[in-house]
């Protein structure tokens, strides 16, 4: 509402630009290993990620979860804030008119408690981030254990406006898995 809404939109735009800058910069590293070997550690996208957005800051929370996940190459299925789901559908219209390929961002609205369980149990979802109360995060971890889904939970209130807490390399790292390639060299 009013100034708060304007600040949230400004912060969301800033966050989108931040992660757009990372799209071609999140690279792997190489390590020298004993015995004439080199190891390449390459981050790869998790695949299909489920994102359960926070109830507070519906736009900024959505952008804070979606942007890092797609910046490193994932496809996302998003459960937006149940309090303001139209913010997510409006954001989707922005993505639809951009260069974003169809199907990269998928938004499902409805009863949060039912959708969370189904998303956590779904075998085609490879990773799941949950921004909700402690009980919901615990439930997501429990339902995701059936197919060893990678999970990351944010329980309790988080200041989504603070870039030190809600953006950065930790989000990019959690959206990838590292593949190590061992290469022998020398004589």
Locate predicted features.
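N-terminal Rossmann-like NAD(P)+-binding subdomain of aldehyde/semialdehyde dehydrogenases
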Residues: 1-37
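C-terminal segments
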Residues: 14-25, 29, 129-187
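Substrate-binding/gating loop at the entrance of the active-site cleft, primarily
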Residues: 31-89
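Short acidic capping loops at alpha-helix termini that bridge into adjacent secondary structure
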Residues: 47-48, 102-105
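Hydrophobic/aromatic ligand-binding patch that stacks against planar heteroaromatic rings
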Residues: 67-70, 118, 143
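Residue-level signal for inorganic ion chemistry
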Residues: 73, 105, 119
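Short helix-initiation/N-cap motifs at beta->coil->alpha
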Residues: 111-115
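Short acidic amphipathic segments
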Residues: 125-126
């Amino acid at each position: 509402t009013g100034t708060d809404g304007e600040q949230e939109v400004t912060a969301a735009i800033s966050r989108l630009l931040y992660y757009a800058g990372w799209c071609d910069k999140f690279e792997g590293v190489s390590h020298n290993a004993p015995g004439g070997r080199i190891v390449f550690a390459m981050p790869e996208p998790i695949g299909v990620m489920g994102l359960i957005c926070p109830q507070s800051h519906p736009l900024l929370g959505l952008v804070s979860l979606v942007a890092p996940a797609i910046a490193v190459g994932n496809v996302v299925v998003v459960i937006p804030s149940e309090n303001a789901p139209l913010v997510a559908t409006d954001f989707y219209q922005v993505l639809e008119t951009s260069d974003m390929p169809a199907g990269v961002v998928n938004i499902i609205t409805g009863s949060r408690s039912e959708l969370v369980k189904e998303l956590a149990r779904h075998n085609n979802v490879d990773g799941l981030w949950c921004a909700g109360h402690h009980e919901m995060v615990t439930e997501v971890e429990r339902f995701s254990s059936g197919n060893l889904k990678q999970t990351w939970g944010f329980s309790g209130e988080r200041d989504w406006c603070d870039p030190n807490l809600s953006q950065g390399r930790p989000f990019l790292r959690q959206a990838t898995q590292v593949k190590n390639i061992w290469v022998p060299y020398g004589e």
